[in-house]
């Protein structure tokens, strides 16, 4: 009894803070401001009220329902819908990281450029093919690092992540108060209520996927439900606190961006270099030169490296660690003496290399390539969130079978409606997000659209091939 009480020591504020560090980042503010300008303030309010809050609480119920499961989403699907769909969920969770892995070395290069040169000129000095070749070399190097299991790098990454988190909050505080403390002039003039109201047109709709991408990943906090004291009350309280904290940071951060960058004339490379521009301007406001920007660039470099190494290794081991031989060939699961899944790493390398080099055939500018890959992530990554809502809908249908300690909505029809809404909204965001955010029907727009349509189908479709290969191997 004493042991059980000792295990459940997390309070609602612990849950809120742990979740906040996991879910939120300064890049979310910059990327969505680059897409929408100050209109994003309205978008944040909508997303947090009608999507993120129910999403987080749904994760809480699923984590409580399957408190002994170690596979996350795939465990939830396995218990509710069988091993076949559980395999597809696990495959989706892994394969959507491929565009993420292809984009991370780019982010490392950009951060290094700002840390060393104090500006964003590094990616302008070389051709796209040369830069993407260097990106591929970086990826191969960090794949080797991941295979060595360097724990010290993860510790450095954690410290860097905390530093970035603190600096993100510092940015909001210093930028919002700058007009009162310094003589800085607000870049966006004539701000009225109409400044924040979006024009609901096709251009606006195509940017929703980036908002969904920004607030996703709450399923990572599900293991903490059953470590929480009085989870039926404290966990949802922590989640609501999380939603308020993220909403405040998103809204104030967006307002701060509006003070620095004219909402009606957003720089074309803001998505690529905006984080560094922001800290550079902040240093100018307070007569600190490039100090804040360099500190942030160094912390971001280390954080991106750690995130890349972790994302190469962890999702793959989740997929292969508890692999069912009916769905995944044994050859793919083969490991070397250090426990590295060699063939799994090779498959990752092939897919990432294609995604790094193929776009250079039709995208001739590094800034556009970076933005394209980031937008592709906003289309592909939320596909894994769909399985969360599928699992929730299944749990609601099987309500008599499961008796979790925490239940989000006890009214079955209402719970089903919320689950379907979250699933439909995520799917809608993914579908509309495939359209490139640039002048339509140009050669590059068509090329990007083709890649945006083909990539999710190819990546998820590969998952349908492996069960056939496994069946063939097992028959021998």
Curated annotation (Swiss-Prot):
Supply the InterPro entries for this chain. Answer: AA/rel_permease1 (IPR002293), APC_superfamily (IPR050367)
Q: GO CC terms for this protein?
A: plasma membrane
Q: Which residues lie on this side of the membrane: Periplasmic?
A: 31-38, 102-125, 176-195, 262-291, 365-375, 436-448
Give a yes or no for keyword Transmembrane helix in this entry. Answer: yes
Where is it predominantly found?
membrane
Domain of life where this protein originates: Bacteria
Where, per UniProt, does this protein localize?
A: Cell inner membrane
**Cytoplasmic compartment: which residues?**
1-9, 60-80, 147-154, 217-240, 313-343, 397-414, 470-476
Per the record, membrane topology reads: Multi-pass membrane protein
Q: What is this protein called?
A: Inner membrane transporter YcaM
One MF term in the entry's GO annotations: transmembrane transporter activity
Under the heading Pfam families, the entry gives:
AA_permease_2 (PF13520)
Q: Which gene encodes it?
A: ycaM
- Annotated membrane-spanning segments are 10-30, 39-59, 81-101, 126-146, 155-175, 196-216, 241-261, 292-312, 344-364, 376-396, 415-435, 449-469
Q: Give the family from UniProt.
A: Belongs to the amino acid-polyamine-organocation (APC) superfamily.
């Amino acid at each position: 009894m004493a042991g059980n009480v000792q295990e459940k020591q997390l309070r609602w504020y612990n849950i809120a803070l742990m979740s906040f560090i996991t879910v939120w980042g300064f890049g979310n503010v910059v990327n969505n401001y680059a897409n929408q300008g100050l209109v994003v303030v309205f978008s944040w309010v909508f997303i947090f009220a009608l999507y993120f809050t129910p999403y987080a609480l749904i994760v809480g119920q699923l984590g409580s329902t399957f408190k002994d499961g170690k596979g996350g989403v795939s465990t939830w699907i396995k218990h509710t819908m069988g091993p076949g769909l559980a395999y597809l969920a696990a495959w989706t969770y892994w394969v959507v990281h491929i565009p993420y892995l292809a984009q991370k070395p780019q982010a490392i290069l950009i951060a290094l450029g700002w840390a060393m040169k104090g500006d964003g000129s590094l990616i302008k000095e070389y051709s796209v093919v040369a830069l993407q070749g260097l990106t591929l070399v970086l990826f191969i190097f960090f794949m080797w690092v991941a295979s060595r299991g360097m724990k010290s790098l993860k510790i450095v990454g954690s410290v860097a992540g905390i530093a970035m988190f603190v600096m993100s909050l510092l940015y909001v505080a210093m930028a919002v108060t700058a007009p009162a403390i310094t003589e800085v002039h607000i870049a966006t003039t004539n701000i009225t209520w109409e400044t924040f109201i979006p024009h609901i047109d096709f251009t606006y709709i195509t940017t929703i996927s980036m908002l969904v991408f920004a607030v996703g990943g709450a399923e990572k906090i599900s293991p903490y439900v059953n470590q929480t004291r009085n989870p039926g009350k404290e966990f949802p309280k922590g989640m609501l606190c999380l939603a308020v904290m993220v909403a405040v940071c998103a809204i104030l951060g967006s307002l701060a961006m509006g003070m620095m960058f004219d909402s009606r004339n957003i720089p074309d490379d803001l998505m690529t270099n905006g984080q560094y521009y922001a800290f550079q301007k902040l240093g100018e406001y307070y007569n600190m030169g490039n100090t804040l920007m360099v500190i942030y660039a160094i912390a971001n470099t280390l954080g991106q490296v750690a995130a890349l190494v972790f994302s190469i290794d962890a999702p793959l081991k989740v997929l292969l660690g508890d692999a069912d031989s009916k769905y995944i060939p044994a050859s793919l699961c083969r490991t070397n003496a250090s426990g590295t899944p060699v063939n799994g790493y090779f498959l990752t390398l092939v897919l990432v290399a294609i995604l790094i080099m193929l776009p250079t055939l039709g995208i001739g500018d590094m800034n556009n390539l970076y933005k394209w890959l980031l937008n592709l992530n906003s289309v592909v990554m939320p596909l894994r969130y769909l399985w969360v809502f599928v699992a929730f809908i299944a749990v609601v249908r099987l309500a008599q079978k499961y008796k979790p300690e925490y239940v989000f909505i006890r009214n079955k029809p209402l719970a089903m409606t919320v689950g379907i809404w979250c699933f439909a909204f995520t799917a809608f965001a993914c579908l509309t997000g495939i359209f490139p955010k640039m002048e339509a029907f140009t050669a590059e727009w068509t090329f990007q659209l083709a890649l945006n349509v083909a990539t999710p189908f190819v990546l998820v479709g590969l998952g349908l091939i492996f069960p056939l290969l496994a069946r063939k191997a097992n028959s021998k």
